[in-house]
Amino acid sequence: MTGLDEALTRIRFTDTGLVPAIVQQWYTRDVLMMGWMDAEAFRRTMTEGRVTFWSRSRQEYWRKGDSSGNIQFVRGVALDCDGDTLLVTVDQVGAACHTGTYTCFDADPLAPVLGERPESAADGW
């Protein structure tokens, strides 16, 4: 069994065969975006040096930057403690978001609503 085969056995894909992949700039640790991968997208990401995703809407593989030039070069891939989410660290060239912003999380931040939590909530809620 290769290292890639072993890694694939550790990933807990959804019932539809997908796993969320959080993309993070390797040197700033900024979270850039989230995309979906299936086993083939994971294999391509691990062997080609560029991040490949599976588009749920278009039902096809895509790589960030193929049309925009905003390429994501893979620096590392980690699996979370539950085995159901990937963290892909990249060297991002240009904007990560399809809107042209550096990160997909630059938009309207949501304010916490701590004053509205239930009385029965623990302090750690």
From Swiss-Prot:
One GO cellular component assignment for this chain's record is: cytoplasm
Q: Which GO terms describe its biological process?
A: L-histidine biosynthetic process
* Name of the gene this protein is made from: hisI
Name the source organism.
Leifsonia xyli subsp. xyli (strain CTCB07)
Kindly give the Pfam families that the UniProt entry links to this protein.
PRA-CH (PF01502)
UniProt catalytic activity: 1-(5-phospho-beta-D-ribosyl)-5'-AMP + H2O = 1-(5-phospho-beta-D-ribosyl)-5-[(5-phospho-beta-D-ribosylamino)methylideneamino]imidazole-4-carboxamide
Where is it located?
Answer: Cytoplasm
The identity of this protein, by name, is Phosphoribosyl-AMP cyclohydrolase
Cofactor note as given? Binds 1 Mg(2+) ion per subunit. Binds 1 zinc ion per subunit.
Highest rank taxon of the organism: Bacteria
